[in-house]
Curated annotation (Swiss-Prot):
Function: Component of the RavA-ViaA chaperone complex, which may act on the membrane to optimize the function of some of the respiratory chains. ViaA stimulates the ATPase activity of RavA.
Protein name: Regulatory protein ViaA
Entry-linked InterPro entries: Uncharacterised_CoxE, Uncharacterised_ViaA, VWF_A, vWFA_dom_sf
Family: Belongs to the ViaA family.
HAMAP family named in the record: ViaA
Tree of life domain: Bacteria
CC annotations in GO: cytosol
Keywords tagged on the record: Chaperone, Cytoplasm
SMART domains in alphabetical order: VWA (SM00327)
The species this protein was found in: Escherichia coli O81 (strain ED1a)
Localization in the cell: Cytoplasm
Subunit structure: Homodimer. Interacts with RavA.
Main location: cytoplasm
Length: 483
């Protein structure tokens, strides 16, 4: 069967212009105009999606099939082009019957054109074919427009759904244009409003806990650039002005305290000859406290010295992915669970803004994994937030899973974050030694987010940084009172 792409090529119909008109009309629709005004960050993300729309429309037109009636009419037209005028005259009745049978828009006009001329000349033959071609072009253009209109309605419906989702989550997850773009890409999945309302709920909870939000931001910024002195610095010459007392006798201007032996007052010099005062003399000499004559003529001169020039290279510390392990034991339920989930949501926000990855592992008796920064990040976040914390505590398995993940090349610069109350058994010696090796050899950093003031110091000593957020009732009341 004839494809629409082939028909467009045969009739020289430009579908590109039709596609551009459709996209312009879509972007100018009132729904998008209101959305762009309300969420300007997402405007750039949607605009960046236009090439994908354009390619999808091209593919749709390319694969579309032409209706059988139009295909048969096109074939008849092509055959008629090959006929000479005498042959065309012979075939004309069959051509008119075929057009009538196919309900072609050209059928009635073709018969009127033939009836208006008693003789079929070569010029009439050419005119007949030209008008027939125009009729086919109109039909092909109409078919293109119908398909594009169907695609426009479908695309507009999809965009509206994604706009609704992105508009709800933009205040929670999009901190800049980069995050807005990644959020828009994630919104392509099939999600119901009831699903992503869970993210909205924890986003509102996070806003009610500004200390927890600031803690996540501090952890995200913890890798700062540091200056590294260079060992290969060369010696360079520096000029400096130094003051030296004149060595020739000059006019006495007064007295001063100094260590100038040549200008000592006689009483000071006399103390040097007294045994009991000799040490006192030397003390005052070292401290430049001897009374001396002050002379005119102290001179300044330029002195040339050589010293190594201090150059510093700024070693930009890479902000790698987050590998977050969350304790889902029973002691982490209730308010602790809410804080842990909201903290992970804050890390997801940072990861989207800084183009980092955010990988969540829930540890209890087994380990469940979620990647919140991937193409299915919103769906993964919803599944994570739906989890209930009712398991046991197996901190050793958590560390083993982290260390296994850090062996991969794509995670070599990751920051490991463990969220727990750290009320657990001590870590095995092999786990402790392996963590210290990763810290020493590969400069991996382990962060602890302590949800309790009663965590075991022996466990927490292994971490590079400990971020404390006490969820006890007293601490919660104090934080609320300070706000």
């Amino acid at each position: 069967m004839l494809t629409l792409d082939t028909l467009n090529v045969m009739l020289a119909v430009s579908e590109e212009g039709l596609i551009e008109e459709m996209i312009i009309a879509l972007l100018a629709s009132p729904q998008l105009a209101v959305f762009f005004e309300k969420f300007p960050r997402l405007k750039a993300a949607i605009t960046d999606d236009v090439p994908r729309w354009r390619e999808a429309l091209r593919s749709r037109l390319k694969d579309a099939r032409v209706p059988p009636e139009l295909t048969e009419e096109v074939m008849c037209y092509q055959q008629s082009q090959l006929l000479s005028t005498p042959q065309f005259i012979v075939q004309l009745p069959q051509i008119l019957d075929l057009l009538h049978r196919l309900n072609s828009p050209w059928a009635e006009q073709a018969r009127q054109l033939v009836d208006a001329n008693s003789t079929i000349t070569s010029a009439l033959h050419t005119l007949f074919l030209q008008r027939w071609r125009l009729s086919l072009i109109v039909q092909a253009t109409t078919l293109n427009q119908q398909l594009l209109e169907e695609e426009r309605e479908q695309l507009l419906s999809e965009v509206q759904e994604r706009m609704t989702l992105s508009g709800q989550l933009e205040p929670i997850l999009a901190d800049n244009n980069t995050a807005a773009g990644r959020l828009w890409d994630m919104s392509a999945g099939q999600l119901k409003r009831s699903d992503y309302q869970l993210i909205v709920k924890y986003g509102e909870f996070l806003n009610e806990q500004p200390e927890l939000k600031r803690l996540a931001e501090q952890l995200g910024r913890s890798r700062e650039a540091k200056s590294i002195p260079r060992n290969d610095a060369q010696m360079e010459t520096f000029r400096t002005m130094v003051r030296e007392p004149a060595t020739v006798p000059e006019q006495v201007d007064g007295l001063q305290q100094s260590d100038d032996i040549l200008r000592l007052l006689p009483p000071e010099l006399a103390t040097l000859g007294i045994t009991e005062l000799e040490y006192e003399f030397y003390r005052r000499l070292v401290e430049k406290q001897l009374l001396t004559y002050r002379l005119h003529g102290e001179s300044w001169r330029e002195k040339m010295i050589e010293r190594p020039v201090v150059h510093k290279d700024y070693d930009e510390q890479p902000r790698g992915p987050f590998i977050v392990c969350v304790d889902t034991s029973g002691s982490m339920g209730g308010f602790n669970e809410q804080c842990a989930k909201a903290f992970c949501l804050a890390l997801m926000r940072i990861a989207l803004a800084e183009n980092r990855r955010c990988y969540i592992m829930l540890f209890s008796t087994e380990i469940v994994r979620y990647e919140l920064s991937g193409p299915q990040g919103i769906e993964q976040a919803i599944r994570f937030l739906s989890q209930q914390f009712r398991g046991g505590t197996d901190l050793a398995s958590c560390f083993r899973a982290i260390m296994e993940r850090l062996q991969s090349r794509e995670w070599f610069d990751a920051d490991a974050v463990v969220i727990s109350d750290f009320i657990a058994q001590r870590l095995p010696d092999d786990v402790t030694s392996k963590v210290k090796e990763l810290q020493r050899v590969h400069q991996h950093r382990f962060h602890a987010v302590a949800m309790s003031a009663h965590g075991k110091p022996g466990i927490m000593r292994i971490f590079d940084h400990i971020w404390r957020f006490d969820t006890g009732m007293r601490s919660r009341l104090l934080r609320r009172w300070r706000r």
